[in-house]
Amino acid sequence: MISTIALFWALCVVCVVNMARYFSSLRALLVVLRGCDPLLYQYVDGGGFFTSHGQPSKQMRLVWYIYAQRYRDHHDDEFIRRCERVRRQFILTSALCGLVVVSLIALMIWH
């Protein structure tokens, strides 16, 4: 029988890998955004997005832009595809992180 702790750690590894994929896709989206829509790139603080001096309020603008699917009216097809990918990966990563938290609580209760 599979150990529940081993299963929990496997779930954590899957979650971390998906987080890395999400951040990589987000970085690629910002590169595409810089080329196709420089004003939006500045609006969401594209240059300082992954730095320690990045502005969280501007970063949240990109999150809400993607969450509300406002990118669907954009003129660049590559940008739309990248936004769709980032949105799907964000939903998947959020669900996996929630599952990790629920699993951790369950492990604390049953062990």
Curated annotation (Swiss-Prot):
Keywords, ordered alphabetically:
Cell inner membrane, Cell membrane, Membrane, Transmembrane, Transmembrane helix
Q: What is this protein called?
A: Universal stress protein B
Q: Where in the cell is it found?
A: Cell inner membrane
Query: Hey, which family's this protein in?
Result: Belongs to the universal stress protein B family.
- Report the leader peptide range: none
Family annotation (InterPro entries): Universal_stress_protein_B
Q: Which Pfam families match?
A: UspB
Membrane topology category: Multi-pass membrane protein
Q: Which HAMAP family match?
A: UspB (MF_01088)
Write down any Gene Ontology CC term. plasma membrane
Coarse class of the primary localization is membrane
Q: Which residues cross the membrane?
A: 1-21, 90-110
Source species of the chain: Klebsiella pneumoniae subsp. pneumoniae (strain ATCC 700721 / MGH 78578)
